[in-house]
Amino acid sequence: MEITASLVKELRERTGVGMMECKKALSENAGNIDASVEWLRKSGLVKADKKAGRIAAEGRIVVVHDGCKAVLVEINSETDFVAKDSHFLAFAEAVAQAALVAGAADVEALKHVKLPSGETVEETRAAVIAKIGENVRVRRLARIDSANNVAAYVHGGRIGVLVEVKGGDVELARGIAMHVAAMNPPYNKVADVSAEFLEKEKEIELSKMSEKDKSKPADILEKIISGKINKIVKEVTLYGQPYVLNPDQSVEQVVKAAGADVIGFQRMEVGEGIEKIVEDYASEVMKQAGLS
């Protein structure tokens, strides 16, 4: 992965470590910021993430849908209070609309897209930060542009879903989007489940078995394990889960009854994957007072 100047800058801001050390850390960790912070900590170059208190883990998921095109954008703020601010919300909506119209493929491309004001997304972001006094981050972008049925669903501004369905109708596609929002399946179909996941689950199931069960004939043991794995696969695939709008049927049964096929989906939830910092104000006050 190319180590860009923006990645080096972000790591420097978070750790206070020199440019060359940051570049080396990013190179060692394939450009992953969080892994690079941990690498620097293990190397003794930094005791903690200096920008930890400025992590933008709140925010808004915005969906814009126009026929067979739809985009999903996550815009982060530091606090839930700012996530409800009118300036923040206006920025989030403008960014999502611009992403749809411009056809931006990723966040890096989106930064350079111009908004109706004439300023780029990145320039406007800087202005919003100056106005509200919190870090604001355009974190993720997903899009679907297809001749198939495309549905978009957002729940409370915190969860957003895009779904592409071949066949069926718009109502079915929207129902599937609502299901994905509620159940968060990691995979679409059985064929999408990774071999690594299956192997890991097999190891876990074997470790949970008693020595008596493990001593059973290989063919019987394989049937027991396969049964457990099949149950797990149903739980982690969209097609295997009971349909939230009709739990008596699986999603696969509902989709096939409509002569349809779910091509894929995208789901985002505000702040997922971001480690939130819990402040210990009592310890901080004692430290500043020289009592600890």
Curated annotation (Swiss-Prot):
Major location category of this protein? cytoplasm
- Top-rank taxon of the source lineage equals Bacteria
Q: Which UniProt keywords apply?
A: Cytoplasm, Elongation factor, Protein biosynthesis
- Cellular compartment(s): Cytoplasm
Q: Report the GO terms under cellular component.
A: cytoplasm
Matching InterPro entries, A to Z? EF-Ts_dimer_sf, Transl_elong_EFTs/EF1B, Transl_elong_EFTs/EF1B_dimer, Transl_elong_Ts_CS, UBA-like_sf
User: What are the boundaries of the region Involved in Mg(2+) ion dislocation from EF-Tu?
Assistant: 79-82
Single GO molecular function: translation elongation factor activity
- Keyword Acyltransferase listed? The answer is no
Q: What does this protein do?
A: Associates with the EF-Tu.GDP complex and induces the exchange of GDP to GTP. It remains bound to the aminoacyl-tRNA.EF-Tu.GTP complex up to the GTP hydrolysis stage on the ribosome.
Q: Which family does it belong to?
A: Belongs to the EF-Ts family.
- What name goes with this protein? Elongation factor Ts
Q: What is the lineage of its organism?
A: Bacteria, Pseudomonadati, Pseudomonadota, Gammaproteobacteria, Lysobacterales
Designated gene of the protein: tsf
